C-alpha cells in the first residue's frame, strides 16, 4: 500500500477542490455509500499521513474538508467534521449492511468503518436497527479488528456495563464473545466482565452475558468471575436475578473456586435461608450432597428450626435438609421440632405441616416411632384441622403400609 502524506496544513489545489465539490454533490444514503456505489477513481489522489501504515485509513480527524483515497477499492470517502453525531453514525452503520461481504472484509474498508464508528460503537450496539450491521462486521472482521472492537468496549467499564444490561446490547456482546479467538482477547473480556460482574449478576440481560462466558470459556478463566461473585455472595444471592446466576456459578465452579463459593453460602446460611431469593442458593448446595456441607448447615441453623419451618421460604430449606442430609443430621432437626413447645403449631401451619410430612417420610426406627407417637397424642387438635389432618393421614397411611408388609411377611413364612 502506498504510504500517505499529510496535506491538511496547506491550501488544497484546484484539483482537490474539484474532488471535494464532486463528492459534496453526490447523493449519499450514509457515509459508507460511496463504497457501495460506483464512482470513478480519483486520478490525482491526495495521500494522507496516518499514525502508522496499518492505520492509514483512520485519518478522519483532519479539520478541513478532506478527500481520502481508498487504495484497496479505488473509491473515496468524504468527511466534514472531526466527530460524528450518533444519528449520523447510525446512518453510516446501517449502510454497511448493503456492502458485499467480500468488500466489507477488506482490511482498509474495515479500518474506515471502525474509525468512524469508534466514538459511538457502544451506543450503536444498543440500537435494534444496528444489530444486524454490527453482527455483519463481526463476521467480516479479522482477529486484529475483533481485538480493536473489544478494546472499544472494555476501555470504559461503565459503558460496557450499560451495553451488557441492555436487551439488544446483551445479545451483541454474546455474539462478540463467540468471535474471540486469541488468549489475549479472551483474557481481556474475562477481566472486563469480572470488574462489573456484581452488577451484571443483578440484571437479567447481564446474567445472560455471564452465563455465556461459562459456556464458552474454560473454568480456569471463568474462576476469576466466580471469585468476584463469592466476595459479594449475599448481595447477589438476595437479588431476584442474582440468585439464578449464583446457581450457574455453582454449576460451573471447580475445586477451590467451588469450595470458596460454598463456604460463603454456608457461613451466611442463617441470613439466606429466610430470604425470598437467598433460600434458593442454600437449597442448591444442600441438593449437591457434598460430604460435610449439609452437616455444617444443620449446625448453622440449630435452635431455629421451629421458626424456620413456619416460614414460607425457609421451610423449603428445612425440607431439603431432611431429605438430602445424612440420617443422623436429619434426626437432629426432627428432635428439635418434636421438643419444641410450638410443635402443635408447626403441624397446623400452612408451611410447617409439609416439613413434618417430610420428616415422617425421611426418618425410620426409633426416631419415626417417637415422632408418630407425639403426633397421634395431638389427635384431638388435628383431626378437624385442615393442615393437621394431612399429617394424621400421612401417619395413618404409613402405618397401614407397614401392617400390610408385616402380613405379607407372615403369609410367606407360613
Language-model features, listed with the residues they occupy:
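Eukaryotic gene-expression regulator signature that favors modular helical reader/repeat domains
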Residues: 1-414
Amino acid at each position: 500500500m502506498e504510504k500517505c502524506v499529510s496535506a491538511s496544513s496547506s491550501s488544497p489545489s484546484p484539483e482537490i477542490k474539484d474532488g471535494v465539490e464532486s463528492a459534496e454533490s453526490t447523493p449519499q444514503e450514509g457515509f459508507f455509500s460511496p463504497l457501495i456505489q460506483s464512482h470513478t477513481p480519483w486520478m490525482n489522489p491526495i495521500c494522507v499521513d496516518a499514525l502508522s501504515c496499518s492505520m492509514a485509513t483512520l485519518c478522519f480527524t483532519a479539520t478541513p474538508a478532506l478527500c481520502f483515497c481508498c487504495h484497496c477499492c479505488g473509491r473515496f470517502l468524504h468527511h466534514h467534521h472531526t466527530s460524528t453525531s450518533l444519528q449520523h453514525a447510525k446512518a453510516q452503520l446501517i449502510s454497511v449492511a448493503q456492502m458485499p461481504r467480500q468488500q466489507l472484509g477488506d482490511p482498509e474498508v474495515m479500518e474506515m468503518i471502525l474509525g468512524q464508528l469508534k466514538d459511538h460503537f457502544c451506543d450503536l450496539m444498543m440500537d435494534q436497527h444496528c444489530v444486524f450491521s454490527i453482527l455483519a462486521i463481526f463476521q467480516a472482521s479479522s482477529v486484529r479488528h475483533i481485538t480493536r472492537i473489544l478494546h472499544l468496549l472494555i476501555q470504559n467499564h461503565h459503558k460496557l456495563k450499560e451495553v451488557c444490561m441492555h436487551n439488544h446490547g446483551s445479545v451483541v456482546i454474546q455474539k462478540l464473545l463467540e468471535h474471540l479467538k486469541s488468549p489475549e482477547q479472551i483474557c481481556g473480556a474475562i477481566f472486563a466482565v469480572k470488574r462489573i460482574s456484581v452488577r451484571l449478576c443483578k440484571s437479567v440481560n447481564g446474567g445472560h452475558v455471564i452465563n455465556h462466558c461459562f459456556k464458552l470459556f474454560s473454568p480456569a478463566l471463568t474462576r476469576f468471575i466466580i471469585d468476584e461473585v463469592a466476595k459479594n455472595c449475599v448481595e447477589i444471592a438476595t437479588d431476584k436475578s442474582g440468585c439464578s446466576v449464583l446457581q450457574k456459578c455453582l454449576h460451573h465452579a471447580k475445586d477451590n473456586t467451588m469450595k470458596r463459593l460454598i463456604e460463603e453460602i454456608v457461613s451466611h446460611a442463617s441470613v439466606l435461608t429466610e430470604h425470598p431469593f437467598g433460600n434458593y442458593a442454600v437449597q442448591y448446595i444442600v441438593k449437591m450432597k457434598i460430604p460435610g456441607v449439609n452437616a455444617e448447615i444443620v449446625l448453622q441453623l440449630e435452635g431455629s428450626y421451629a421458626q424456620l419451618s413456619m416460614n414460607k421460604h425457609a421451610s423449603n430449606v428445612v425440607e431439603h435438609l431432611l431429605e438430602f442430609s445424612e440420617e443422623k443430621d436429619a434426626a437432629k432437626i426432627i428432635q428439635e421440632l418434636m421438643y419444641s413447645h410450638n410443635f402443635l403449631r408447626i403441624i397446623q401451619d400452612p408451611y410447617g405441616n409439609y416439613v413434618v410430612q417430610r420428616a415422617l417420610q425421611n426418618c425410620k426406627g426409633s426416631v419415626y416411632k417417637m415422632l408418630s407417637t407425639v403426633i397421634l397424642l395431638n389427635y384431638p387438635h388435628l383431626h378437624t384441622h385442615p393442615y393437621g389432618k394431612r399429617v394424621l393421614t400421612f401417619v395413618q397411611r404409613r402405618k397401614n403400609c407397614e401392617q400390610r408388609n408385616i402380613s405379607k411377611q407372615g403369609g410367606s413364612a407360613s
